[in-house]
């Protein structure tokens, strides 16, 4: 498997996280603050300049109010992100 910032699989994973952030109505700055990271951390992984690991994926999902296990299952199954109650992914 290709381990690249530009692989279609990785791009889809990042698109999933971006969609969850948008569905939750959370700006990059707010997410960064929740994670205790600079806004550039969010911009870099969303822009494809930086990879995230599984621990970061879990932290990001939780900071956005999403269940990381469900989110990853849906990603693997190729399901699109849907906005649930209060704009949260569900």
Enumerate the language-model features and the residues they cover.
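Short, charged recognition helix plus adjacent turn
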Residues: 2, 8, 62, 70-90
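The DNA-recognition helices of helix-turn-helix-type DNA-binding domains
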Residues: 38, 49, 75-79
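Short basic helix-loop element that most often maps to the first helix and adjoining turn
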Residues: 15-34, 59, 85-88
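Short, basic-rich loop-to-helix N-cap that marks the start of a DNA-contacting helix
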Residues: 49-61
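Short coil turns linking two alpha-helices in DNA-binding domains
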Residues: 27, 38-41, 53, 67
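A short, Lys/Arg-rich alpha-helix, primarily the initiator
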Residues: 1-23
